[in-house]
Regions:
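Conserved SAM/SAH cofactor-binding pocket of Class I
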Residues: 1-64, 70-73, 79-84
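Short, catalytically relevant binding-site loops at active-site mouths
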Residues: 59-60, 77-79, 124-127, 149
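S-adenosyl-L-methionine-dependent methyltransferase catalytic core, i.e., the SAM/SAH-binding region
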Residues: 70, 138, 144-145, 157-161
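Hydrophobic alpha-helix-in-membranes signature
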Residues: 74-75, 121
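Mobile active-site "lid"/loop adjacent to the S-adenosyl-L-methionine
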Residues: 75-102
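Conserved Class I SAM-dependent methyltransferase catalytic core
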Residues: 99-148
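SAM/dcSAM-binding transferase cores
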Residues: 151-196
């Protein structure tokens, strides 16, 4: 499993928990994030299967010949918007260090022929990523649109799954809250096994 932009390692830890025989590699360009990730990895029961590297996706794809069966990412997603005065915050939230096209190119190079790529993005950015993957014949096979509440008109995030082989697309709407301060049954179900 490859976690692109691992941050503090939360997705990597979740993957190690859900896939007990998998090795997980987290990559990030921020040294403090990688150090925090490694600390979190050392404190977990899966530490022998977790690695973190300070390297960009652009560099990693050039040096690693492995194909991954699963790639996950919660990538930077703000495009052409006001950046922060903090370069760390800007890199974590904006596509200045990893564009949608670079993400698509890297995933195409590193994903095995039967592998899956999962990511979490705002709705508009997810549309742009789907378009970027067209060049590589990578298709969105599942999309879950996440809303804060059932009566909301706009999704706050899309959880997308991509595959190199064309298959049918599954589309769902899901909600985080049933009402203010009360998580939905779906949200409780998907987070029930996470040990964080």
């Amino acid at each position: 499993v490859l976690d692109i932009g691992c941050g503090c390692g939360i997705l990597s830890l979740g993957m190690a928990q859900f896939f007990p025989s998998a090795s997980v590699v987290g990559i990030d360009i921020d040294e403090d994030s990688v150090n925090e990730t490694m600390g979190n990895f050392r404190q977990s029961r899966w530490c022998n299967r977790l690695k973190a590297n300070k390297i960009s996706l652009q560099e990693y794809q050039l040096h690693d010949g492995n194909a991954f069966d699963l790639i996950v990412s919660n990538p930077p997603f703000f495009e052409n918007s006001l950046t922060s005065s903090s370069s760390v915050r800007t890199n974590a939230r904006h596509t200045v260090a990893l564009s949608i096209d670079e993400l698509a190119f890297g995933v195409n190079r590193l994903l095995s022929s039967d592998g899956l790529f999962y990511c979490v993005l705002p709705l508009q950015t997810s549309v742009n990523l789907k378009l970027a993957f067209v060049e590589y014949s990578i298709c969105c096979v599942s999309e879950v649109r996440v809303f804060s509440f059932e009566n909301d008109n706009t999704a706050i995030r899309s959880i997308l799954a991509f595959k190199k082989k064309l298959t049918c697309k599954n589309f769902e709407n899901r909600y985080i809250y049933e009402e203010p301060n009360k998580h939905s049954q779906w949200y409780k179900w998907i987070t029930r096994d996470l040990l964080l």
